[in-house]
A protein has these predicted regions:
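Helix N-cap / beta->alpha transition motif
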Residues: 114-118, 196-202, 228-230, 242, ...
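Assembly/oligomerization interface modules of large self-assembling protein complexes
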Residues: 35-110
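Intrinsically disordered, low-complexity, charge-biased terminal/linker regions in eukaryotic proteins
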Residues: 1-56, 60-61
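Sequence/fold signature of self-assembling virion shell proteins
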Residues: 2-11, 18-19, 26-27, 209-305
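Extended, solvent-exposed, turn-rich assembly/linker loops in the middle of proteins
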Residues: 156-230
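A short, structural micro-pattern
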Residues: 106-108, 190, 232, 277
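Alpha-helical scaffold segments that mediate packing/assembly in large oligomeric complexes
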Residues: 111-188, 304-305
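Short, Φ-rich (hydrophobic/aromatic) sequence segments
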Residues: 32-47, 182, 252-270
């Protein structure tokens, strides 16, 4: 049975999930839950949508001479002066590397460990997978995005004169000017533009753009459709978030393409762990990500003030 279908009632989906637990099929229940959680992370997480992630194999790990923490060693981008890694829990303090190669450390992200009676699970009237999303996916997603954006902000702070621009914003033309400044910012660093990240409300501001800024066809399309479902501005891919603690309104982050900027690995992708004891179900989600930024110049921020 598919846990993603909208054609089956929540009661039937929940019953199928609980029946697996009652039948000793914890592994199957974990697989179904893990698949759903991973899907939602890639659909809604900021860094999961910005970059492609690859599961790394144990033979790609490199022994750490100081401890047993997992790591891999990768080449820094050819034109880069510095490289670093995203400080997930367990990776240690952030450091910058100037040599030809640098390490990517794998951390651990774990949701809160929850316990719930299967009788309580039976009483949930909405899809239990949606309940897992609210109680597991959001915790993991928040930790991923927070660790990444903290790294990005730290990089920009150390080199704000070259990687940040403030644009006075009072009319739609200023919005376009800010966007163009972001494009030019990466170009001045001798890098192409990959994707742009911003708050959803900042993206909605693009509805104020006039026909002389976006063209007649662009205006007609937006009048008919609005911006929901869009994922670009002037042909550049845009990724949005509604979390102002991750990206505040009126800020735009321009990233170089992944090949010029970062490497994203998973020692283990998000996995739902379930343990059934009598009527109690214990569960939590964990993963082991590692993200290296091979070129700290691959980011440019524009602030609209």
């Amino acid at each position: 049975m598919s846990y993603e279908t909208t054609q089956v009632s929540a009661e039937l989906v929940n019953k199928a999930f609980i029946d697996k637990l009652d039948s000793g099929m914890e592994k199957e229940a974990m697989q179904a839950g893990s698949q759903f959680i991973r899907m939602k992370l890639y659909e809604e997480g900021l860094i999961r949508r910005l970059f492609d992630w690859r599961t790394i194999t144990p033979d790609e790990l490199v022994p750490n001479t100081d401890n047993d923490k997992p790591q891999t060693i990768v080449d820094k981008e050819a034109e880069a002066t510095k490289a670093t890694f995203v400080g997930f829990k367990g990776t240690g303090d952030r450091a910058y590397f100037e040599g030809r190669r640098f390490p990517i450390y794998f951390g651990k992200i774990e949701s809160e460990r929850l316990s719930k009676s299967k009788f309580e699970l039976m009483s949930i009237r909405h899809d239990i997978m949606q309940w897992l999303k609210d109680n597991q996916v959001k915790m993991v997603q928040q930790e991923e995005d927070e660790a990444f954006i903290e790294t990005v902000k730290d990089i920009i702070t150390t080199n704000s004169s070259d990687q940040e621009k403030t644009v006075a914003y009072s009319d739609p033309e200023d919005y376009k000017e800010g966007f163009v400044e972001g494009l030019k910012g990466l170009t001045s660093l001798r890098l192409p533009v990959g994707k742009v990240a911003m708050h959803q409300n900042t993206y909605y501001e693009s509805l104020n753009l006039t026909k002389d800024l976006v063209g007649h066809k662009g205006m007609d399309d937006r009048w008919e459709r609005g911006v929901d479902g869009e994922n670009s501005l002037w042909g550049y891919p845009v990724v949005t978030t509604i979390k102002d603690d991750i990206i505040p309104e009126d800020e735009m982050y321009f990233f170089a393409p992944q090949d010029y900027f970062c490497k994203c690995y998973l020692l283990q992708d998000a996995t739902l762990f379930l343990k059934n004891e009598a009527d109690m179900v214990h569960f939590h989600t964990y993963e082991a990500p590692g993200m290296g930024i091979g070129n700290t110049k691959g980011i440019f921020r524009v602030k609209l003030t």
